[in-house]
Each structure stands twice: as C-alpha cells, then as structure tokens.
C-alpha cells in the first residue's frame, strides 16, 4: 500500500524547495538562490494531524523555453502530477501573476488532479491576504498566503492538504526499508542505472556532467523486500567544486553513504578506476558500509573469453580496500545483469547484519593459530591470542584479546581477518578487528568488579 502524495509544482525560484523543507520539517531539499537547482523529482515523508504522506519536490516548470534541461524537467513534473493525490501550485506573492503562472494554471486546470494554490513569500499576514487575492485569476480556486521561510500559514495549508486527500486512500504499512545508495563520479551512468532498476524514467539522463544535482529517493518492492534507492549527485574532486548547487548535492551524497545499508559504487568500464573512485571507495570503507561494485557500460567494451577476468583483476588492484565487495559487470543502457544487483546487495546487507556466537569465533581462531602461530619479536617475546568475541554488527566488529597488540603486525592481522572471512563469510561487508592487550583487559575487569561492589553496597 502506498502513502498519499502531494506534488509541489511551480515556476523556477518561487520557493518550492524551501516550502518542501518547511512541510517536511527537514533540510533535505537543496535550497539555493538560483533557478534550476531542482531537476529530478525528489521524495520526502511528512506527517500532519496523525496522517502520513509523501511530498514530491519538482523542478521549475517552464513551457515556453526548451533550453538546457527544461524539457526533461517538464517530463519529471508531468510524471509527478500523474502519480500525485494532490497538486500544490506554488507562486511568488511579491512578483504577482506572471505569464509562466498562467501557462501552468491552464495545464493544471486540464488535469484530473485536485490543485491548491499556495502564494509564497507572504511574510506579513495582513499584506499576504492582499497579495494572494491577485491569484484568483488563475482559475484554480482560493489562493492561500504562506511564508515558507517563517512558516506562517503553513499549518492551515497542511490542514487543506489533509482534507484534500481521497478518503479511501490506504495508509502505507510500517515496513523496514533497505537503503541502497548509488554512488559514483559524474557521468558514470548512475541515473541510467536508477531508471533501469525502476523500469521508468525516474531521473534525467544526459551526457552533460552534473545532470543530477540532488539525491533522488525511490521506493521499490523486490522479492518481498522494500528498497529505498538513492541516486546521488556525481562527486568530483574538491578543488573543482564551486559553492552552490553541486556543493550541496555532494554533501548530500556523502550523507547518503553514511546512512546507507549498502552502497552501489558505479565504475565506468571504459575509464577504469580513477583517483576519485578510490576516494569514494575509501569513504565507503571508512564508514563501514556494505558495498557492491558495479562496473557499468560493459556493452561498450571489446572482449574475449578472458577479458572479464583481466579487467576485474586490474580494477580490484586499485580498489584493494574493498577487496571484500562483490563485483558485477552490467549495462544500464541494455539492462544486462541490472537485476542481479538486488541479489548481491541483499546478500551484502545480510552479512553486514550477521552475528556469530563466541564459541564459533574461537573455533576459527584456534584453527588459525594452529596453521600459523603469532610472530615472535627480536626480543624473544611472542604474541599470544587468548580469545575473541563479536561485539557488534553493522559492520561486524570483533574484539580479540591478546597479551600485547604491538606484537601483532599488519601481516598477521590481515591473516586473521582472512581466516575469519574464509570460515565465516561476510562477503560484501567490511569487518573490524579490535586488538586489546592484557593490561587493558585487566583494567576493564577491575572496573567491572568495582561497579559490582558499588551496586552491592547500594
């Protein structure tokens, strides 16, 4: 079952995204004093008077101009209206009625979707009524003055929105969502991949770098699992990013990585792994996210029977810190292997959430010690690994208790991680090993005993 939705529609720069943030009580929609900041339609959840619904932010609608992305933006607005339960037509009270407003109003009058006119930038309540009265001429009923910046009038507006929803529309069941972020440099095919996954033109696609300026959320049901898929803005080198739309979009993309259950890192099969790809991979590993590496544009590569193995070896040598990730080769354009992404992403999320009993962990460690003893230093002191336990998941984290962490070099630590993976799996997920010395362990035990004594005395 789906939530009712309202489509926010209007000319460029009338304050649609600011109003979206006000209605949703968030800062998720990018707000910047420049037309064309919002291009694709973006979704946010909101609630009012105990009723939950979705707010769909759209790009500035212009009918008389076909330059840049305006035709594609129109398509996105049309799709938003098509699926909406109600349209909120936002106009600028300070500018008054414009030819652009009249064109949009004519189009909305021909739509079957109910429309409410919100006259924005009415910061003064008394003046707002006067400013709003001019918009009766749009022929869409009573215009309502609001201030997206200060919030005045938005409560009354939300009451109208709730009353305007169809009474028989079901409210969405509470269901856990798996959040999957599509991450990558500009123009590697992230939006094409989103469209291929959804089976519709969910995002604007072009050869121009930076077409996607914000993170686009899409809900999709796949094999009894509900996925929230986020297409993020392409992330370039910091020195090439100017303050403005791209800056905010990239910050949003980084936040998406941090909040994701699983990241899909998209690599261009033609360009291979760049420095920026490595930095993105490092961010994913640093944040402890599950990951699937997707090599896009595979249809453009000339290949023989060994090409895929050679290319994978080369890519993995540069993405060595994601050695645990599954790598698949796809074509977003033709749809080749696109649906396999869900299978690998679900497996990665499952491994990311896994917990293993202490007894099983120690069986693996015992076997690992049998194959290869801890190193002995020149001083003659040898490392001793007493036992280990999993202390958390997402990502799976293990504490290993030893006599002295300094006696375990990087080579042996990698060996232990390899043995844990070999015996316990965790493909698609990072794992963290915390090495704790005897002194630290004894200190923790002593602290624990003191706490027990304090409790007993009380």
UniProtKB/Swiss-Prot annotation:
The keyword Repeat applies. SUPFAM superfamilies: P-loop containing nucleoside triphosphate hydrolases. Pfam families: KH_dom-like, MMR_HSR1. GTP 1 binds at residues 10-17, 57-61, 120-123. It comes from the Bacteria. InterPro entries: G_ENGA, GTP-bd, GTPase_Der, KH_dom-like, KH_dom-like_a/b, P-loop_NTPase, Small_GTP-bd. Coiled coil: none annotated. GO terms for molecular function: GTP binding; ribosome binding. Keywords: GTP-binding, Nucleotide-binding, Repeat, Ribosome biogenesis. Residues 4-169, 178-353 form the EngA-type G domain. GTP 2 binds at residues 184-191, 231-235, 296-299. One of its GO terms (biological process) is ribosome biogenesis. Residues 354-439 form the KH-like domain. GTPase that plays an essential role in the late steps of ribosome biogenesis. PANTHER family: GTPASE DER. NCBIfam families: GTPase_EngA (TIGR03594), small_GTP (TIGR00231). Belongs to the TRAFAC class TrmE-Era-EngA-EngB-Septin-like GTPase superfamily. EngA (Der) GTPase family. Associates with the 50S ribosomal subunit. This is GTPase Der. The gene is der.
């Amino acid at each position: 079952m789906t939530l009712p939705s309202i489509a926010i529609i209007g000319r460029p720069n009338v304050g649609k995204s600011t109003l979206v943030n006000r209605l949703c009580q968030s800062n998720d929609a990018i707000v910047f004093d420049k037309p064309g900041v919002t291009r694709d339609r973006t979704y946010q959840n909101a609630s009012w008077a105990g009723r939950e619904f979705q707010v769909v932010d759209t790009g500035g609608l212009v009918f008389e101009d076909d330059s840049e992305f305006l035709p594609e933006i129109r398509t996105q607005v049309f799709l938003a209206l098509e699926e909406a339960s109600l349209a909120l037509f936002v106009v600028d009270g300070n500018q008054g009625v414009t030819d652009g407003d009249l064109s949009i109003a004519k189009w909305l009058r021909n739509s079957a979707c109910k429309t409410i006119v919100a006259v924005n930038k009415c910061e003064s309540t008394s003046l707002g009524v006067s400013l709003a009265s001019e918009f009766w001429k749009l022929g869409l009923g009573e215009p309502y003055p609001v201030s997206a910046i200060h919030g005045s009038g938005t409560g009354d507006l939300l009451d109208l929105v709730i009353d305007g929803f169809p009474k028989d529309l079901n409210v969405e069941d509470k269901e856990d969502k798996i959040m999957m972020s599509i991450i990558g440099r500009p123009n590697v095919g992230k939006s094409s991949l989103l469209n291929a996954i959804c089976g519709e033109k969910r995002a604007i696609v072009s050869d121009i770098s930076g077409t996607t300026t914000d993170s686009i959320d899409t809900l999709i049901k796949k094999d009894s699992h509900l996925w929230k898929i986020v297409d993020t803005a392409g992330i370039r080198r910091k020195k090439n990013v100017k303050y403005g739309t791209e800056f905010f979009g990239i910050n949003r993309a980084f936040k998406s990585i941090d909040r994701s259950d699983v990241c899909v890192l998209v690599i261009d099969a033609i360009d291979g792994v760049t420095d920026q790809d490595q930095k993105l991979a490092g961010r994913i590993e640093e944040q402890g996210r599950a990951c699937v590496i997707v090599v896009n544009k595979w249809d453009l590569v000339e290949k023989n029977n060994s090409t895929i193995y050679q290319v994978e070896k080369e890519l993995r040598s540069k993405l060595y810190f994601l050695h645990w990730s599954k790598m698949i080769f796809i074509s977003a354009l033709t749809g080749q292997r696109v649906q396999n992404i869900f299978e690998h992403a679900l497996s990665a999320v499952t491994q990311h959430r896994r917990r293993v009993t202490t007894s099983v962990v120690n069986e693996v460690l015992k076997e690992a010690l049998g194959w290869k003893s801890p190193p002995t230093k020149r001083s003659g002191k040898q490392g001793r690994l007493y036992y280990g336990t999993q202390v958390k998941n997402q990502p799976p984290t293990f504490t290993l208790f030893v006599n002295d962490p300094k006696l375990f070099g990087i080579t042996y630590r990698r060996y232990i991680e390899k043995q844990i993976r070999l015996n316990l799996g965790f493909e698609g997920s990072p794992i963290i090993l915390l090495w704790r010395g005897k002194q630290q362990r004894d200190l923790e035990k002593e602290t624990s005993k003191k706490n027990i004594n304090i409790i007993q005395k009380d």
